[in-house]
């Protein structure tokens, strides 16, 4: 058996940071990007010897894989007055990858070409995720009494698209077999949560906390399969 393989990979990245401080406002942000691209070629030869019969399978293939990832987030704090503070924290994530492959295979028996198979495929995936948090808090006394309203929100979606095509030709009986398939998957959803927190100070450095929370989630998914000759 003999297998040779060679490939080339390229990588790239980028990062940006920003910081601002004003009298009552603080702002922080960060953006990060990472991407890769790999190209790979392969060749395989398999020799099988059984009694007086000999069979050889030869195949060549090419694969390419690309990935892209991006993350961006920020932080904002605004001291509206001496006892009231607003905080906002958003984040965004996205990712995408593409895979492409193709191959050609021949089967030989006793130096006679028996079959040929040509196949190709693609696979694309993409997704994103968004989250946001906002909190408004207010101090009601110097002893630790305070109240806060916090809202969280999130949204996400992803999709997958796969396609596989193959054609096999059998020379002995001169027939052909075709197999084609496409698969699609889609998922999306969102959620949010609202919280109201009240803190009451007690003697001897103890605190009593009251919390009300409401949360909602919704998700949807679809799956499709297509086959044709």
Please provide the spans of the model-predicted regions:
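A short linear-motif detector with a strong N-terminal bias
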Residues: 5-8, 65-66, 112-115, 126-130, ...
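Extracytoplasmic loops and strand-loop junctions of Gram-negative outer membrane beta-barrel proteins
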Residues: 1-2, 54-60, 112-120, 131, ...
């Amino acid at each position: 058996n003999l297998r040779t393989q060679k490939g080339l990979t390229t990588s790239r990245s980028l990062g940006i940071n920003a910081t601002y401080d004003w009298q009552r406002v603080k702002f922080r942000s960060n953006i990060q990007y990472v991407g890769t691209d790999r190209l790979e070629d392969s060749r395989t030869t398999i020799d099988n010897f059984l009694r007086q019969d000999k069979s050889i399978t030869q195949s060549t293939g090419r694969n390419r894989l690309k990935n892209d990832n991006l993350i961006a987030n920020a932080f904002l704090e605004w001291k509206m007055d001496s006892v009231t503070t607003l905080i906002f924290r958003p984040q965004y994530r996205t990712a995408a990858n593409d895979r492409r492959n193709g191959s050609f295979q021949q089967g030989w028996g006793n130096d006679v070409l028996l079959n040929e198979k040509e196949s190709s495929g693609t696979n694309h995936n993409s997704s994103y995720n968004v989250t946001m948090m906002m909190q408004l808090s207010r101090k009601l006394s110097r002893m630790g009494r305070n109240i806060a309203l916090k809202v969280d929100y999130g949204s996400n979606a992803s999709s997958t698209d796969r396609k596989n095509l193959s054609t096999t030709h059998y020379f002995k009986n001169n027939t052909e077999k075709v197999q084609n398939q496409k698969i699609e998957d889609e998922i999306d959803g969102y959620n949010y949560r609202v919280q109201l927190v009240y803190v009451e100070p007690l003697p001897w450095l103890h605190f009593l906390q009251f919390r009300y929370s409401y949360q909602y989630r919704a998700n949807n998914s679809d799956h499709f399969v297509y086959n044709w000759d």
